[in-house]
Amino acid sequence: MARKKISVIGAGNVGATVAQFLATKELGDVYLFDVVDGIPEGKALDIQEGAPHWGYDLDVVGFSTSDSSNYKNMEGSDVIVVTAGMARKPGMSREDLFDKNVEIIADVSKNIKKYSPDSIIVVVSNPADIMAYALQKISGVDPQRIMGLGGSLDSSRFRTFLAKELDVSVEDVNAFVIGGHGDDMVPFIRYSSVAGIPIEKLLPKEKIDAIVKRTRFGGGEIVNYLKAGSAYYAPGISITAMVESVIKDKKRVIPCAAYITGKHAEHYGINNKFIGVPIKIGERGVEEIYDIDFLPEELELWKKSVASVEASSKNVDEWLKKHPQ
């Protein structure tokens, strides 16, 4: 049986880490792309040379897109992971990256449209939900085949902080985060539990509030430690979980940025935009979107997140008017 093909656009810390995780989990041949000459080739070779110890028999190869014709090597990809873009620095929000990253996403989108429009696409470049929207608008790819990182990573952080506070295994913590992948994300307390026991029965409100706040600013906490660059290990494995569910058709339910339309638009109060909600991920991409009910106070938080995503998506529309693709 032919191996799957996974292309990773961007060979920085996140892209290279994703490539390594994809290889070690033997999800398919990995094609690594970057605009800087030598970086994707060197990192791909480095990952390939670790194969004897990890035991993976697959190809990891790199291509520099300073020669744009090298994008043709992503043709026929089962999954494309888009990590290309500027990294956050201390004091920056994900939204501050918009101007730089939308230009990069525009170039990537046109090449996806040209060489591999039928791939499932995972958008990681920040702000991920907004860049997913830009990519879909420019590439014309079926939005069901596009999902953005956000809730997968934010939920992993939320679960980690809860597990550490309670001194329990992370495997027994069920919790998720919805909304935009920014400071207005919504960690959902009411659906959070440990082995089925509601979090609110295990922790006092002030502890929960502190964990929610830390989750919202979890990425910034790491940026402040690193000074230059942002998180990549937790994003890398969060992305890999999404890709694995596509490649193996696992039907995992993971909160991710998905395109909201139809009956879901009426429920969530946002239409034809990407925002983080619980979705089922399989070989066809976003195979189902789950509507969750809100209590009044939860709805207010959700509406704030929606407003933030709507405003940033409008920036994409305005940018596209000035820069027709």
Curated annotation (Swiss-Prot):
CDD domains with a match to the protein in the record = LDH-like_MDH (cd01339)
Keyword terms, alphabetized = NAD, Oxidoreductase, Tricarboxylic acid cycle
- Which GO terms of the molecular function aspect are on file? L-lactate dehydrogenase activity; L-malate dehydrogenase (NAD+) activity
EC numbers listed for it are 1.1.1.37
Statement: the UniProt record of this protein carries the keyword Oxidoreductase: yes
- Keyword check for Transcription, yes or no: no
Example GO BP: tricarboxylic acid cycle
Instruction: Give one Pfam family, short name only.
Output: Ldh_1_C
Alphabetized InterPro entries for the sequence: L-lactate/malate_DH, Lactate/malate_DH_C, Lactate/malate_DH_N, Lactate_DH/Glyco_Ohase_4_C, Malate_DH_type3, NAD(P)-bd_dom_sf
Q: List the disulfide bonds.
A: none
Binding of NAD(+) occurs at G10, A11, G12, N13, V14, G15, D34, N101, V124, S125, N126
According to UniProt, the reaction catalysed is: (S)-malate + NAD(+) = oxaloacetate + NADH + H(+)
Entry binding sites for substrate? R88, R94, N126, R157
As for family, the record states: Belongs to the LDH/MDH superfamily.
Biological function: Catalyzes the reversible oxidation of malate to oxaloacetate.
HAMAP family on file: Malate_dehydrog_3
Q: What's the protein name?
A: Malate dehydrogenase
Q: Which organism is it from?
A: Thermoplasma volcanium (strain ATCC 51530 / DSM 4299 / JCM 9571 / NBRC 15438 / GSS1)
- Gene name in the database record: mdh
